[in-house]
Curated annotation (Swiss-Prot):
Gene3D superfamilies named among the record's database cross-references: 2.60.40.2970, Collagenase (Catalytic Domain) (3.40.390.10)
Entry annotation: catalytic residues: 314
UniProt protein name: Neutral protease 2 homolog MGYG_06241
Catalytic activity: Preferential cleavage of bonds with hydrophobic residues in P1'. Also 3-Asn-|-Gln-4 and 8-Gly-|-Ser-9 bonds in insulin B chain
Organism encoding this protein: Arthroderma gypseum (strain ATCC MYA-4604 / CBS 118893) (Microsporum gypseum)
């Protein structure tokens, strides 16, 4: 169903269900249904004013957008010398099942909502000087009071230039401080004393399966160009080589003592509503949330989510495995298969769904996990 005629012409390009603000999305239409204005409110504080310019109410999903309440990338931040600032926040993978009304923002026509955030909490602002902030993205939309996603609205903010004092920015508490966290499969392959045997076995099995699935997908890339085109929008040899190499790197990283630190539980305390798992790309760490443990070991639904493909998705977010690390430009087969190639190649779900959809060779087994 399409009911936002102002964006119908670009809906095929912005089809991702969830999209991080990104500089790679197509140019915004001149008459945007959703208008976003960035306003400076302090050294590193920003206010985003989101306005519904359309003639119908919008029920906007906040996940992975400028309205996300988690410490995610709300804006792109670029130093005056052209260098993009390191992102130190989280890349959450959200479950799209049973979405509650609380994760939506409802905007009547011409109404606005304000979101205030501090970019210093999730960006490494190590140098004083001028920074340019901008935001682009596609917001999933439900109709009326419903929570079923039926469309997307595109937004592009103004470019905001801010003079930032790095010394003041350094005083802002970071979303993820350097402290000791337990519950990790350590780099020597041992088991942390706080990681229960049950959780250890669940994650170890999922890693083994992810390694097998990603490796099989990597080896099969060259054998079916049309299947590759289905997921990545191209059969360019360089793109196929890149995906094959990345899938093999993901397979090799799906181990206890590899480049990724796999945690047994949410020792960072960021498993908020509908978060399945999340990655800290600046630290190459992955944290599972309770929805992860209730996923199938192997799903019998084509292109569906299970434990191994969730770990493949998270591995693609880690710069120790994939450079540049993948973002979340879209979730789900219907959306990722319509991304333009440059976004598909940098979208974590394209890798996990491609691997699961084509090379998932195991019988389905549903395991409901007990946290004890």
């Amino acid at each position: 169903m399409q009911f936002f005629t102002a964006i119908a012409a670009i809906s095929a390009l912005v089809a991702p269900a969830l999209a991080l603000p990104t500089q790679e999305l197509p140019q915004a239409p001149t008459n945007q249904t959703l208008h976003v204005r960035l306003i400076p409110t302090g050294n590193t504080m920003v206010k985003a004013v989101v306005t519904n310019n359309g003639d119908r109410p919008l029920n906007l999903l906040k996940f992975n957008t400028i309205m996300d309440e988690n410490p995610t990338a709300k804006v792109n931040v670029v130093h005056e010398d052209g260098e993009e600032v390191e992102f130190t926040g989280m890349l959450p993978r959200y479950s799209m099942r049973s979405l509650p009304k609380s994760v939506f923002t409802r905007l009547a026509p011409k109404d606005s909502v304000e979101h205030v955030f501090d970019i210093a909490t999730v960006h490494n602002l190590k140098r004083s000087g001028k920074y340019t902030l901008s935001a682009r993205g596609a917001v999933p939309v439900a109709e009326g009071d419903d929570t079923a996603i039926i469309d997307h609205v595109y937004y592009q903010s103004n470019d905001l230039t801010m003079e930032i004092d790095a010394r003041k920015a350094a005083l802002i508490p970071r979303a993820f401080e350097d402290t000791h966290f337990a519950g990790t499969l350590n780099r020597r392959g041992g088991l942390n004393s706080t990681c229960s045997p049950r959780r250890y076995q669940v994650i170890k099995r999922a890693l083994n399966d992810a390694r097998m699935i990603a490796s099989s997908a990597s080896k099969a890339v060259s054998s079916n160009p049309e299947k590759f085109r289905e997921f990545f929008g191209t059969t360019d040899p360089n793109a196929m080589k890149q995906v094959s190499e990345r899938l093999m790197a993901i397979a090799q990283a799906s181990v206890e003592n590899g480049p990724i630190k796999w945690h047994c539980f949410d020792s960072r305390g960021r498993c908020e509503q509908n978060v399945v798992a999340y990655t800290l790309p600046s630290r190459n760490e992955v944290f599972p949330c309770m929805p992860f443990f209730t996923e199938s070991d192997f799903t019998n639904k084509c292109h569906a989510q299970d434990k191994p493909t969730t770990l493949i998705h998270e591995a693609a977010h880690n710069p120790s495995v994939v450079q540049p690390f993948c973002r979340d430009h879209g979730y789900g087969y219907d959306h990722v298969s319509r991304l333009p190639p440059r976004l598909a190649l940098q979208n974590a779900d394209n890798y996990s769904i491609y691997a699961q959809g084509k090379f998932h060779l195991h019988l389905p087994l549903k395991v409901v996990f007990s946290p004890n």
